[in-house]
Amino acid sequence: MYKKITLILTCVLCLALVGVSCKKKEQTEKKHTLTEAEMTKAVKDFIQQAEKSVRDGKADFLNNAVDTVALKAAVEKKGSALDLGAGMEIFHGNCAFGDYLCAIEESGGSFRFDTTYVKNGLHHVVLRTYDGNGNFQFEDLQIGFRNGKALIQDAFLYSITSNLSDKIASESTLNVFMTIDNPTEDARNMIMATALCANGEYGKMWKLLNEQRANLQQFTSFYKFYTIGLHECSTDFAGDLEALGADMRFNLYHQLCHAIRTGNAEAAMQHISQLIDYTGDDPIYWVLYAKALTNAKQYQEALAAYNTAKQGMDYIWDIWTGELTCYKRLRDTETFNNCLQAGKFLYGLSDDEIADMGRNF
């Protein structure tokens, strides 16, 4: 009887302890639930730390600011091949935001966190990049929170109308198909399109992608190669773009690229105005507008646009070379030479490098 009572008391005590433990756990979890104001502050802190670390040439903060657990779960939902071939290498390569932004800075480009917003309870940060070759991108970062800190959980990539998780899933799957003897017909066609693009055979690539569009849109790289073909081969740019039925941000991004390339400054400004509704304002838009004006041979107007850009951002390489192009086309030799010499203190160029640049223009 005594043993029975002791056993009962022990069980009661255990249950009580479990109850206390659960209660403490609940209190701890409640304690770590962030308010909207705290989440907003965490996002602001994330942006400030990211900017400072990249300016200091340090990639670690942003490389570690990805919620790899959440991103991997999103990738695996899409039936990827992360555990096969180079799957995990592809995954980690796409997560290296710090390396990515540091490389852009080192190339003479720039980046900017343009705007933040909250939609359906999810925090977003729009990142703009502009590399040393004049390529610009917008990425809508989807932010989650862990231990009070903001982390990147996924991102919408304007240029390919896909989430980062879709891109990783598609790339890892296609990578496996490239290593086996009998890939699916769709994978073979996508591999062929990749090879045609690498060889500069845009016409053949464009024909293949249009013929197989319904089957190949499962691969995010389809949008990359399709838009290359669109810019190189299409006789109805707007119509072919709309036919994809893609996200409006993708459409506006590529319409702007097309307007810049063809020197349609009026259309460029129209698309910029529409994109600002999604990205927030950014002085890089003045650089892009200046490029459209330059291609339209409106050099004085382009110089004015570059000057406006400089008031809101660093004097990046493309602004400098853009101004040099305008002065050269205007045959303003004196101002051209003065601007050229500025390359010594702006970018640390030697006399020989300055002389080479002068000859190239």
Task: Name each model feature, range by range.
Residues 147-207, 299:
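Low-complexity, intrinsically disordered terminal/linker segments enriched in charged
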Residues 105-176, 354-361:
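Exposed beta-sheet edge and beta->alpha loop/turn motif
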Residues 83-133, 242-249, 276:
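Surface-exposed, charged secondary-structure patches
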Residues 194, 226-229, 257, 291, ...:
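Residue-level recognition of tetratricopeptide repeat
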Residues 41-43, 120-122, 135, 181-190, ...:
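Generic helix N-cap/helix-start motif at coil->alpha-helix transitions
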Residues 199, 231-233, 262, 296, ...:
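Structural motif corresponding to the intra-repeat A-B loop/turn of tetratricopeptide repeats
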Residues 22-56, 180-189:
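Short, low-complexity N-terminal intrinsically disordered segments enriched in polar/charged residues
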